[in-house]
A protein has these predicted regions:
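Pair of pore-lining "gating" transmembrane helices in MFS-fold secondary transporters
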Residues: 6-33
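Membrane-interface helix caps of multi-pass secondary transporters
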Residues: 26-45, 127
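Hydrophobic alpha-helical transmembrane and interfacial-helix anchor sites in secondary transporters
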Residues: 37, 71, 157-161
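Central cavity-lining transmembrane alpha-helices of secondary-active solute carriers
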Residues: 52-70
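C-terminal ends and interior cores of transmembrane alpha-helices
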Residues: 86-100
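Cytoplasmic helix-loop-helix junction between adjacent transmembrane helices
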Residues: 107-146
Length: 167
């Protein structure tokens, strides 16, 4: 293996870490910005309706995990990853227009399509293809460690910003 291919693997792995951390932010923003989003969506005092958005997302995720493996095997994983990232971003923009509750439910089902059906299995397949047989354990370990560290860094940055705003 040449040095270039090792550096190419590292760059690809870093991009996968960033993609995996980023794509799941939109569906789960509701936890971080509970009250402001509830107000913006017109769901103040309707905690059950607000929670139902993530409930629908979770149920759709469970249903779509199995066919996600088939989709990842049937189509090019790089194209699926690009489709997933772009379409999740478009759904986030649509959600930012604060549409009706029915449309919000639809958006969360579509989030499941873009983050699980087309993204999750494809990302696992891409990382699997990135590593040789003897490297796969280390590659997946590095992927998960990188996701954890980058998630920690993002959380610390967010908390620091919130503390600074209160001062």
């Amino acid at each position: 293996m040449t040095q270039k291919s090792k550096s190419s693997k590292v760059v690809t792995l870093i991009l996968m870490i960033l993609a995996m951390n980023t794509i799941y932010m939109l569906p789960y923003l509701m936890y971080t910005y509970y009250t402001p989003l509830q107000e913006a969506m017109g769901l103040i005092g309707r905690d059950a309706d607000y929670g139902r958005l993530l409930n629908v997302y979770g149920i759709a995720n469970v249903i779509l995990y199995l066919p996600g493996g088939w989709v990842a095997d049937k189509f090019d994983c790089k194209k699926l990853l690009i489709f997933s990232m772009v379409s999740t971003g478009v759904l986030g923009i649509w959600e930012a227009t604060f549409p009706s509750y029915t449309i919000l439910l639809l958006i969360h089902v579509l989030f499941a399509v873009t983050t699980v059906l087309t993204f999750w299995s494809s990302s696992v397949k891409c990382v699997n293809m990135l590593a040789d047989d003897g490297e796969q354990g280390g590659m997946f370990g590095s992927l998960e460690a990188g996701r954890g560290v980058s998630g920690l860094v993002l959380t610390v940055m967010q908390q620091t910003q919130q503390i600074a705003q209160k001062l």
